Swiss-Prot record:
Similarity comment: family membership: Belongs to the DMTF1 family.
Protein name per its UniProtKB record: Cyclin-D-binding Myb-like transcription factor 1
One Pfam family linked to the record: Myb_DNA-binding
InterPro entries to which the protein is assigned, alphabetical: DMTF1_DNA-bind_reg, DMTF1_N, Homeodomain-like_sf, Myb_dom, SANT/Myb
Domain Myb-like: 225-263, 339-388
Required for transcriptional activation, as annotated region: 87-170, 459-761
Region described as Disordered: spans on this chain: 24-51, 584-625, 740-761
Lineage, uppermost ranks: Eukaryota, Metazoa, Chordata, Craniata, Vertebrata
Gene disruption: observed consequences: Mice spontaneously develop tumors with a mean latency around 80 weeks. The most common tumor types are pulmonary adenomas, adenocarcinomas, hepatocellular tumors, B-cell lymphomas and vascular tumors. The protein appears to be haplo-insufficient for tumor suppression, as heterozygous animals are also prone to spontaneous tumor development. Mice lacking this protein also exhibit enhanced susceptibility to tumor induction by activated Ras or the application of dimethylbenzanthracene (DMBA) or ionizing radiation.
GO molecular function, one term: RNA polymerase II cis-regulatory region sequence-specific DNA binding
Gene: Dmtf1
Length: 761
């Protein structure tokens, strides 16, 4: 990745050129990376290699004038060997307590994820040798080891799973096969002989490890859930009858062979359950020290045969013995201290200092060494799993992005100790807060292009947008209020990328004036409800946009639309409706137009018009419904159901437990269900209590229902911008919760153990 940053990790950019987006059939935003075009790449950059990912302009560049800064990215061609990477954009506003600096700019922090560089899809000789070997014998392993080859073991990272799934999809597409299960479970070995070697490209793992992973992913019987007492009894009977014929036992129980094998391994007829007695603890300690030739008080975490320990203890299984010793008894005997919140923050910082690309590369033994409050390396890793679940979609972000988010979260909690203790109540403001920060995360993942279209590389973007109130340094006690907006609908939203700004209170409670560094003002209404949908209403002038929170009832039952546009020197992103696109991929295309200037709009227009799109894309027109008035303001809604994508959110450990108790409720009259996940959690963005003098950082989208699909503008039905009135002040408290569904419950201990056992194979 190329930037012009010098001593800092932060660079300041202005709009350089336009970028083209589309949307695929799965609802992903697609960033098209144009080839070397003299119109899109400056002459001084033309000599640069064509394999850059992003090109950013520096604030110090002499070509940048004093215009209001805007966000822009010029995408240059991606090479065929390029892999997915992560970009974290952080919009930072530094303002005085009572005024906004004219020099305030929008900054972008780039976080490069190079962890896939070592596992290129083309593969080096080393990777190819490993990923093409089954390792069926010890001689195979020894042979490659003696040649200096190394390979990954243990848990699979998210990036590895992404590579595996992408390889499988390419294999199916090339052979016209719709379902991978046809190959895995129905074809003979001869028919699928090249399958596993093909999908293993780019993975530094033996073929047998890939084979086991694929079986677990596609065998539905492997995800049935926890064994019931009845199944345990049935399993015991089948084990006596069939011995180690795991396939037969699994078929009888409706579970996979690997699942029943692992469950039998952990099962013991004579096991006690519940609280350990003092006699059991004493016997466990004696057996462990005897088998490891250690003294009482010594720390023992490795080299223990738990099967042998369980046999000597007699009343507990090997799983119970291992858990009791590593999570409590050894720590108690060695005089350990209690784990504190400071230890949790210290763990995050220590992991960040390791600078590893994947958590599977962490040496937990080394990390736990000399740490008195750590009960064992295994316990420390379990503690890390608990910590990272504070990020709701921790499974969907890369490890560097996850670490960065956790560091920011705990830094905020350190500066604001009452943040999570009183989300809706009152409290004292933070005197250390002198700036407002908003994080906008963009995840860029490489996609395979359609063979029917010219082979240009592309990348998919997912943009969680979060809104957080940040109180002033001298403000009195106030309540914390935050909302999270997620973007991913049937048609793309029209929204404006704004420079940095702050929020000025108005005379109406809950309504603020969004003041940028220019003269533009954007009144904004926010409610205390943690789940809101922001909708654009009629502007009072060409310089303003009204944003109002609507309740889900109105979103579902009306079809009124309105689209507004600020004709100011900003970057406007617009879209077209799906039905208007003549693309074989059924994609939608939109452009970031960076060439808008005030001179382009000498007079306020009488009607709103769409930006110019490429010739091959129909030009949708944007109109304001004539029925727009005070009575209909609460009826603005999406014409089509919207699927909200997951955003990076913060959850406390208590909320994680509470979330597990919630049940998913299907919406009654949606063709496509709203999907939200634990939106009541505080966001990852910096938050403190809010008062009338609060400052806020946000990027405002308009929901996709505000995109008018019609190609014809009825000029008689379009009201002049200056004649529309502000209707929202009477309705600013009409928001209510969207139907939510809880996050998946934390993995049970049984399933975790099964996963650990499999990873050892």
């Amino acid at each position: 990745m190329s930037t012009v940053e010098e001593d800092s990790d932060t660079v300041t950019v202005e709009t350089v050129n336009s970028v083209t987006f589309t949307q695929d059939t799965d609802g992903n935003l697609i960033l098209h990376c144009p080839q070397n075009d003299p119109d899109e790449v400056d002459s001084e950059d033309s000599t640069e290699p064509p394999h850059k990912r992003l090109c950013l302009s520096s604030e110090d560049d002499q070509s940048i004038d004093d215009a209001t800064p805007c966000i822009s990215v010029v995408a240059l061609p991606l090479s065929e060997n390029d892999q997915s990477f992560e970009v974290t954009m952080t919009a930072t506003t530094e303002v005085a307590d009572d005024e906004l600096s004219e020099g305030t700019v929008t900054q972008i922090q780039i976080l490069q994820n190079d962890q896939l560089d070592e596992i290129s899809p083309l593969g080096t000789e080393e990777v190819s040798a490993v990923s093409q070997a089954w390792f069926t014998t010890k001689e195979d392993k020894d042979s490659l080891t003696n040649k200096g080859h190394k390979w990954k073991q243990g848990m699979w990272s998210k990036e590895e799973i992404d590579i595996l799934m992408n390889n499988i999809e390419r294999y199916l597409k090339a052979r016209g096969i719709k379902d991978a299960t046809e190959i895995i479970f129905e074809m003979s070995k001869d028919e699928r002989k090249d399958f596993y070697r093909t999908i293993a490209w780019g993975l530094n793992r033996p073929l047998f490890a890939v084979y086991r992973r694929v079986l677990r992913m596609y065998d539905d019987r492997n995800h049935v859930g926890k064994y019931t007492p009845e199944e345990i009894e049935k399993l015991k009977e089948l084990r006596i009858k069939h011995g180690n014929d795991w396939a037969t036992i699994g078929a009888a129980l409706g579970r996979s062979a690997s699942s029943v094998k692992d469950r039998c391994r952990l099962m013991k007829d004579t096991c006690n359950t519940g609280k350990w007695t003092e006699e059991e603890e004493k016997r466990l300690a004696e057996v462990v020290h005897e088998l490891t030739s250690t003294e009482p008080g010594d720390i023992v975490t490795q080299g223990v045969s738990w099967a042998a320990v369980a046999e000597r203890v007699g009343t507990r299984s090997e799983k119970q013995c291992r858990s009791k010793w590593l999570n409590y008894l050894n720590w108690k005997q060695s005089g350990g201290t209690e784990w504190t919140k400071e230890d949790e923050i210290n763990l995050i910082l220590r992991i960040a200092e390791l600078d590893v690309a994947d958590e599977n590369d962490i040496n937990w033994d080394l990390l736990a060494e000399g740490w008195s409050s750590v009960r064992s390396p295994q316990w420390l890793r379990s503690k890390w799993w608990t910590i990272k679940r504070q990020i709701a979609n921790h499974k969907d972000v890369s490890f560097p992005v996850l670490i960065k988010g956790l560091k920011q979260l705990h830094e905020n909690q350190k500066n604001n100790p009452v943040l999570l203790e009183n989300k809706s109540g009152s409290g004292v403001p933070n005197s250390n807060c002198n700036s407002s920060v908003q994080h906008v995360q963009i995840r860029v993942a490489r996609l395979e292009d359609n063979t029917a279209i010219s082979p240009s590389p592309m990348a998919a973007l997912q943009i969680p947008v979060q809104i957080t109130h940040v109180s002033s340094t001298d403000s009195p006690a106030a309540s914390v209020d935050s909302e999270t907006i997620t973007l991913n609908s049937g048609t793309l939203q029209t929204f404006e990328i704004l420079p940095s700004f702050h929020l000025q209170p108005t005379g109406t409670p809950g309504t603020y004036l969004l003041q940028t560094s220019s003269s533009q003002g954007l009144p904004l209404t926010l409610t205390t409800n943690p789940t809101v949908t922001l909708a654009a209403a009629a502007p009072a002038s060409p310089e303003q946009i009204i944003v109002h929170a609507l309740s889900p009832e109105h979103l579902l039952n009306t079809s009124d639309n309105v689209t507004v546009q600020c004709h100011t020197p900003r970057v406007i992103i617009q879209t077209v409706a799906t039905e208007d696109i003549t693309s074989s991929l059924s994609q939608e295309e939109l452009t970031v137009d960076s060439d808008l200037h005030s001179s382009d709009f000498p007079e306020p227009p009488d009607a709103l018009e769409a930006d110019t799109f490429p010739d091959e894309i129909p030009r949708p027109k944007m109109t304001i419904q004539p029925s727009f008035n005070n009575a209909h303001v609460s009826k603005f809604s999406d014409q089509n159901s919207t699927e909200l994508m997951n955003s990076v959110m913060v959850r406390t450990e208590e909320e994680i437990a509470d979330t597990d108790l919630k049940q998913e409720e299907p919406p009654s009259d949606l063709a496509s269900a709203y999907v939200t996940e634990d939106l009541e959690s505080p966001t990852i963005v910096h938050q403190v209590h809010q008062t009338i003098d609060d400052e806020t950082i946000l990027i405002v989208p308009s929901p996709h229902g505000f995109i008018q699909a019609s190609d014809v503008i009825d000029t008689e039905s379009v009201l002049p911008l200056t004649t529309l009135t502000d209707p929202i002040f009477q309705h600013h408290q009409e928001a209510s919760n969207i139907i939510g569904s809880s996050l998946g419950s934390p993995v049970s201990e049984d399933s975790k153990d099964v996963e650990d056992l499999v990873n050892c194979h």
